[in-house]
Structure formats: C-alpha cells, structure tokens
Amino acid sequence: MKERKVIIKTGLNLENSYTSLPEIFFTRQNPNRVPSPKLAVLNYPLIAYLGLNAKVLQSTDGVDILAGNKTPEEAIPISQAYAGHQFGHFTMLGDGRAILLGEHITPQGERFDIQLKGSGKTPYSRGGDGKAALGPMLREYIISEAMNALGIPTTRSLAVVTTGESIMRETELSGAILTRVAASHIRVGTFEYVSRWGTIEELRALADYTLQRHFKKRNDKENPYLFLLQEVIKKQAELIAKWQLVGFVHGVMNTDNMTINGETIDYGPCAFMDVYDPETVFSSIDIYGRYAYGNQPNIAAWNLARFAETLLPLLHINPNEAIKIAENAISDFTKLYKNNWLSGMRAKLGIFNEELEDEYLIEDLLSIMHKYGADYTNTFRALTFDNIEDTVLGGKVEFDKWYKLWQERLTRQEESKLSSRQLMKSSNPSVIPRNHRVEEALEAAVKEGDYSVMEKLLDALSKPYAHSKEQDYYSTLPEPSTCSYQTYCGT
C-alpha cells in the first residue's frame, strides 16, 4: 500500500520504538482512506498538555491526519498483535481496527502512543470491516475524559472525526475515527500472545522493552522480571480500587483489556453504577455476571495470574521454582487491593487515620445502602454535606445507628470535623457520567448533529469535585423506566 506521508506542523513529534521489537509483535499497516472527514470534537486541554498545534489540527490537513488520509512524515503506522482470554476463553486477537501512528514525545519528554481507532481493516480484523461508529467513539471520548478528571489512570481521547461513510451494524450508522492517546498499548494479552506463539527470546525482548519504557527505576540486583510482575500487580491493585471507589463497571475485563502500565483501556460496555449493588452488570453479553462490579477485584487477580504464567520462563530456570515465585507475587494482590480500597473509603468518610474496625464500619454502610437501594455517588455526596435526609436512607433506623458510630469514629482522630469535610469533598465526586446523561448527549450529537449537549456534559465532568450548583442537573437520578441500563461493545 502506497504511503501518504506529509510534512504538516501539527506539533506531533513521533518515534516508534515499538518497531524495534521482533516483527511477531506488529504488522506495518497504513490507515484506510475515508471519503469526507470532518472534525466532530477536539480535546483542547489535552492538545495543550501534549504540546500540539490546535489551529493546525483543526485545518483540512490536520483533520486528514486525524482521519488517516495523510500520515505525518515521521510516522511508522503499525497494527499490534496480541491475544487474550475473553470471558475466560483464550483467543488470538490484535488491533482489528486500530493503527498506531507512533509515539509522540512531549516537550516535557513524556512518551505517548497516538492511535487511530476505527481506521479500517488490518491483518487482525478477523472478518470485520475495521470501522467504528460515531456513537461509540463519542462515548469513549466522554467516559475516558471523565475518568481522567476523576484522577483514574486512563487512556485519553484527543479527537473524534466523522468519516463521511455509512457502516453497517444492525442498522446503518455514521462512521467515525477516535484518536486515542495512551502511555502504551502493551497488554497482558500481548504477553499471552508471545508466550503462546513466540520464542523465549521474543518474550524476553518484550519484557525488557516494557521494563525500559514503564519501569526504569529498579534495583539491578533484583530479578528484573519478578520486579516487572510485582509492579504490574501494584498498578492494577491501585487501578481497580479506584474503579470501585467511584462505582465504575468496566464490563469487559478480558486480559487483552488489562494494560501493563495500569491505565484503563477500551470503554465498550462500561458504565457507572447508580444504585449500589455489587452484582451490577451493564454489558448485554455478560449474562452470567463474570465482570459484575463486585467481582472486578477477583477478575483482576485472575488476569494477573495469566500474566504471571507468561513470565514463568523468565522468572527462574527451574519451572517449579518459577511457579512458586509467581504464586507468591500474585498472592500479594488481594492485600494491596484491599489496602488501596480501604484507604480510599476512609477518605470518602473523612477518616484520616487507621483503626482495625474501619472495615466493618465501611461494610456496614454499604450493606445498608444495598438494602435500601441507595444511590452510590449521591449517598457519599449527602454524607459530605450532611443532608442524608434527602436520600432514601433518611429516617432509617439502621442508618441512624451507623451514623452515630461514624460520628464517634470521627471524634477519635486529631483532625477537625472541618478537615474531614474537606477530605470528603476531595474524595466524593459531585458528578459522574450518569448513563442517562451520556445517552442524552450522544443522541443529540449523533441524531441531530448538536454537540452542545455533549460539550456541557464534558464541562461538568471536567470538574467532578467542584460541588457547584451548575452540576446539579448531572447528578439527578434516572427515571425508573431507564434504570435497567444496558451497554453494548461498540467501541
């Protein structure tokens, strides 16, 4: 395929260190041309952070780059190979509709993948058309930016362009391409892929590359591959705890959707929980609740065990010793996760120090919330501003008893009630991407071409801890008829 390389001063400063790996890990692939690209949304704060030129990206040439019609001169476009356990079953995968243009080096020296998602067929498309629809791309843009504002590690969304194409799914939909920005796209599934179909030398090359790119600070006397495993476990323990603290349900925690660098990736059937229920599932295909809200920590541990299995040949020359090393490392996940989660829950309740009974206090509150169908986000918001009477828990005997114990707990710390209130305000968001508000924004954009609803939503979501009056509209609960919300893997 003939390359369409151009010199356009977008500010992109691209390298592609990933192509230094053996060719088993990728295939060189140009994006498909699209007939009539138009800019739908551009992320100006992210553009500024990356040191890019917003004016040029808005131009015809800039939009052509975001659509894949033109390729920056220094780009080496590739699709990445990986495998994965999907709902527990192993399969070969790869970038079926995504092209990595390269790695942008920011003025601060940070390295970020720049990927076009929905850019056409690749060798890994497995019969698909490689295209993406506008609605799911806008949805990923909204959710990923909300996650970033909440302080949760995530891939970012730089832009969405419409392609001028119609793509066939169950109905005819408008085509679109998302420009995704990530610290990298190395997944547990990348290691599974080379473990199954590569050599030990290729596995070592990937592990060494990952260490160099993401985990440079290490004691050289340590086993570097054990260090890699331990660091990935730590990052995932932190990430999953942060998901749980805001009621985020990923929906498709396959091993190909677990990044090595600890970023949330692939926002297909994700959603935020309204009413607190550990069994909350939104994905239309997760009929057995494998990826339910309350099961996410267990699934993370399962995925990490699959990652550890890929590293066994590097952990020790003796297979039995390698298994022991891996099992010891994986056994740390539960404790690491719980410590992160407890720390976050204490903050949500204004608690600064640790007491052994804190876990019981927290679990009792969650049990009461579950019993009475309390909204997760708004309950903690009500506790923050001491207006619980406005929630379903107001006047409930069990809650009143719990509230008294909580107040007694707050008096047993040196910090003042005012300090506790400030801690709670910075730990309990006033606004999350409520499913009905996201759908409202998508419907206006996709069906009517009106992006103003989405822009207002994004503005509210960009300041989740502002607790401003203007955000009240976005914190209202859905009507009962819309509570049984289902998501589909369109991204």
From Swiss-Prot:
Residues annotated for ATP binding in this entry: G94, G96, R97, K117, D129, G130, R180, R187, D266
Sequence positions that bind Mg(2+): N257, D266
Keyword Manganese: yes
InterPro entries from the UniProt entry: SelO
One Pfam family named in its UniProt record: SelO
Active site residues per record: D256 (proton acceptor)
Enzyme class: transferase
Catalytic activity: L-seryl-[protein] + ATP = 3-O-(5'-adenylyl)-L-seryl-[protein] + diphosphate; L-threonyl-[protein] + ATP = 3-O-(5'-adenylyl)-L-threonyl-[protein] + diphosphate; L-tyrosyl-[protein] + ATP = O-(5'-adenylyl)-L-tyrosyl-[protein] + diphosphate; L-histidyl-[protein] + UTP = N(tele)-(5'-uridylyl)-L-histidyl-[protein] + diphosphate
Protein name: Protein nucleotidyltransferase YdiU
Species for this entry: Clostridium botulinum (strain Langeland / NCTC 10281 / Type F)
Taxonomic placement: Bacteria, Bacillati, Bacillota, Clostridia, Eubacteriales
Gene that this polypeptide is encoded by: ydiU
